[in-house]
């Protein structure tokens, strides 16, 4: 690193701090990594330091960074046409719709293309209400569905508290207890969770409820697993009352859990799927809402009241077509399942070394380590929706992780482990060695 490099890095960081806003952050005191380029599971800053990316950006860069095949596909499309109105069609749009229909189960054969995950969720909510003529949407506490107004109201994440007074109406939340802290066994948890949902539906009036919206697998709330058989029960309840089931696969979709979609681990078929992140792996902003033939048929002779200027953007569609091809060509979904099993084995070994590791929850390569102060009481190292002074230990752990050359998502008492699907055993070992060293800080606060 020389003086010119330091000067360049400082200028890049300062321009970003001076002229841009950072999401979910206090704007003072931010210390971002100035990323120059990425390759596979690694990011490189302007000083030449390498970071292993153990959260795939924000759980979206599933194929890894810097894949030239996506660049080439984007260039080819831009050399033909970069934009057409959604009223026109392109080869990329049709190819993508056809491929998505092939990989989605059941009769989920129609795609409405959006610009991100939140817009996929917003349009799912809108369409569910229009299709059913009902107004209420049921969602889970401790969930996240995006940061737009409707998506944030739908979520059960505490980041919405600051805008609760202005939130979109008619979202009803229900609780699903956390298995790690449930004292009465998984079978009883399933019974209680199902009974609770049935009570809420009865209290709210089933004829008022348009849809139940759930994540395919829990992500940023802490990878909180559904009890075995839960989603099948929810599917049956929805069928009984004419309620639609919407699965949010924005984070858990596209191989992240070892299957194309997280809900496929539960052997169900929803009525709609919201997707984004892994659809283009962050190479371009893009999203999609897949709907059943039954829902789509309602609009054969009636106007579909959905629209976006950038819907079915040709360049984004081309990137998505190539991305889906890479999943298959590189066997990434199979690798996610295999590496997920390997991670389970290795974290179990880490538990023997670190008294602060309370639990590890994953499905494929969507997982997190939960740190605790006491394994017997399961007191978390930082509480739910922790205040700044309650995050001191975890902030020190996060700082050490970054110092040692890792980028990952640390939230409350969770350290997320969600590397790109191309990750190898050797790279997992490299990443876990960094996490292990950082966790020694937390070990000092156990009792």
Region locations from a protein language model:
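Conserved N-terminal phosphate-binding loop of PLP-dependent enzymes in the Aspartate aminotransferase
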Residues: 2-447
